[in-house]
């Protein structure tokens, strides 16, 4: 009887680096210390990459602050994914909006 070879699928990992210049900005690449596919201008603005973690993407359904499908697609197509910080909350605007709604409700 012929032996059946076991097919090994290539696991997908990403290496995540924290920016030394920009708070809450992260760069995801496929291999540790391989920034060969990252544009030079992006690297200048990013600063010295600081290793944050190595993360397996296979079997994972989501990431905390990034869409996992977008990350996988970007890694495959361009070799990196840049995670920018969320936009700042405008607490004053939110407060005034809520206060305006309360005023409108009492004037009816």
From Swiss-Prot:
SUPFAM superfamilies, per the entry: YcgL-like
Domain YcgL, chain residue ranges per copy: 12-96
Pfam families according to UniProt: YcgL
UniProt xrefs under InterPro entries: YcgL-like_sf, YcgL_dom
Signal peptide: none
PROSITE patterns: YCGL (PS51648)
Source organism superkingdom: Bacteria
Protein name, as recorded: Protein YcgL
Natural source organism: Shigella sonnei (strain Ss046)
